[in-house]
């Protein structure tokens, strides 16, 4: 299996990819380096495919990878309570149904100008 090292140890690389994948699912668009964008594309595609399956085993597999972060918080005036949605709930309830008719290719990578400071090639990765 080929992958990019991204200048990190394996545990650091896996943690970074989990964080970036979760951020992309929450925000639906992030700015990162080209190499990182190409690497997280693989995991995001797998997570959305799990979301499309939608069964309990797929939900548990996705929960083992996606961080438990709050995606959105809403205030309900009637009950005077805040309700929050996690990244996993957003994946299964909002993102996966959007791609029900699409077989792969859920992300788009747009190259942008190099980063100031070290001229690293930058890219925007977003959900289509």
From Swiss-Prot:
InterPro entries: Ribosomal_bL17 (IPR000456), Ribosomal_bL17_CS (IPR047859), Ribosomal_bL17_sf (IPR036373). One of its GO terms (biological process) is translation. SUPFAM superfamilies: Prokaryotic ribosomal protein L17 (SSF64263). It comes from the Bacteria. One of its GO terms (molecular function) is structural constituent of ribosome. NCBIfam families: L17. HAMAP family: Ribosomal_bL17 (MF_01368). Belongs to the bacterial ribosomal protein bL17 family. Part of the 50S ribosomal subunit. Contacts protein L32. This is Large ribosomal subunit protein bL17.
